[in-house]
Amino acid sequence: IYVDQCKLKFYELSENTNPVTTCTDYIHANYQNDITLSFLCELVHLNRTTLNQRFKQQLNCTCIEYLLHYRLKISQELLSNTNLKIDDIANQCGFKYGSYFNRQFTKCLGISPSEFRKNPTGYSMFEGDKVMKL
């Protein structure tokens, strides 16, 4: 609990901070951990609806969609550049279950993680900083 309180203090909003930026910075630094929408709402002092509306306006996706796609982006890098087992990559990217990771990866990219590893070029879920709608 103390560590979570310290994280909250570190990411606490100032008056001029964009809540979406605060959340994405937190996600980038902590994607491998359990992150909930409730926690992110608490982090930026907004309710779920408002936070998701701001994410949709700025990034074309909800907060949790962004988290999922960011985790999948990291997994693409690991699949391309390491020989780690797919279940280990899933775990390192914050997925509790390898089967869920496989399902989401295949759903979002149209190719399984093992197929992606064989031919990793030409697949992306991001266009600049925005999540592409697939």
Language-model features, listed with the residues they occupy:
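Short, charged low-complexity intrinsically disordered segments located at boundaries
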Residues: 1, 21-29, 54-58, 134
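An amphipathic alpha-helical interaction segment
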Residues: 1-11, 50
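Secondary-structure transition/hinge residues
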Residues: 2-3, 31, 83, 121
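A short, Lys/Arg-enriched amphipathic alpha-helix from helix-turn-helix/homeodomain DNA-binding modules
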Residues: 8-35, 41-44, 68-84, 126-128
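Basic/polar phosphate-binding segments, predominantly the helix-turn-helix DNA-binding elements
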Residues: 28, 34-70, 90-115
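…primarily DNA-binding HTH/wHTH and HhH modules…
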Residues: 103-134
